[in-house]
């Protein structure tokens, strides 16, 4: 029979549990005299306690797993906040930050675009960070590169609006036309699209998506809440209100 594979955290918890099981046994007056207990007897007592109380170790392991999951999520959210170079909508200095993992060929991203614009028009204290996450096509990558490049030139919002309201699949011609209409210097744009800095921004987003277990678009993150898929404007407003209520 294949033996179960224990992780480092499990082994650590077993050692800790063994210690506390020992303490519980030794608090019994019958076993209080350490000198009268040899190692073999002690091992037998600990084993018997564990066998008689399996739910204790099960609950302890569950609590350990929950703590580890929470720690990993907090680390992933901290990494998400590294947003230098990411395109931004709304108020760049807004006190509430919302992140959207987005792809310009994503129909659901285009569906949620309108509600997002409405919320940003109503609320001037939101910094809305676009995490360029090109996963659907090669043109998605080109569009993401151009988005980051238009952010450098300060014309990203209009570029973003043009592509998000484009009903069909995008092409390089569509991308360059959107950038040109937004007022971008196309020669500089193409240089920035192919820069190491732009590649680093996209790679950072891919790493962040993996850490947060976001595999599709759109994916919104508000505080510690991760919302996969498109949502309505009312749902977005509710989540924003809940996040602000948490902060007091």
PLM feature spans:
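Short coil/turn segments at secondary-structure boundaries
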Residues: 61, 91-92, 222
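Structural alpha/beta surface segment adjacent to cysteine/selenocysteine redox centers
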Residues: 99, 104, 110-180, 184-185, ...
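A short structural micro-motif
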Residues: 66-67, 166-169, 181, 196-199
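C-terminal cap of thioredoxin/glutaredoxin-like
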Residues: 9, 17, 33-39, 43, ...
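N-terminal targeting signals for export/organelle localization
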Residues: 2-6, 16, 20, 27-78
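Short amphipathic alpha-helical/adjacent loop interface patches that line ligand
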Residues: 54, 113, 206
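A short beta-strand-turn-helix
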Residues: 79-96
């Amino acid at each position: 029979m294949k033996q179960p594979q224990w992780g480092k955290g499990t082994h650590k918890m077993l050692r800790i549990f063994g210690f506390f099981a020992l303490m519980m046994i030794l608090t019994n007056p019958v076993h209080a005299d350490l000198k009268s207990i040899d190692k073999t007897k002690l091992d037998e007592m600990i084993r018997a306690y564990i066998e008689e109380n399996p739910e204790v170790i099960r609950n302890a392991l569950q609590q350990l797993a929950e703590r580890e999951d929470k720690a990993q999520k907090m680390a992933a959210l901290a990494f998400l906040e590294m947003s230098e170079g990411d395109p931004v909508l709304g108020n760049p200095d807004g006190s509430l930050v919302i992140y959207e993992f987005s792809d310009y060929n994503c129909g659901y991203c285009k569906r949620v675009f309108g509600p997002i614009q409405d919320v940003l028009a109503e609320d001037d204290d939101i910094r809305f960070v676009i995490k360029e996450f090109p996963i659907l096509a090669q043109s998605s990558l080109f569009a993401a590169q151009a988005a980051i490049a238009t952010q450098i030139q300060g014309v990203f919002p209009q570029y973003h609006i043009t592509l998000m309201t484009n009903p069909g699949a995008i092409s390089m011609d569509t991308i360059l036309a959107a950038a040109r209409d937004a007022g971008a210097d196309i020669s500089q744009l193409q240089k920035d699209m192919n820069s190491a800095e732009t590649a680093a921004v996209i790679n950072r987003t891919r790493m962040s998506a993996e850490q947060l277990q976001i595999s599709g678009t759109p994916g919104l993150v508000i505080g510690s809440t991760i919302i996969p898929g498109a949502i309505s404007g009312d749902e977005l407003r509710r989540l924003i209100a809940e996040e602000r209520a948490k902060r007091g």
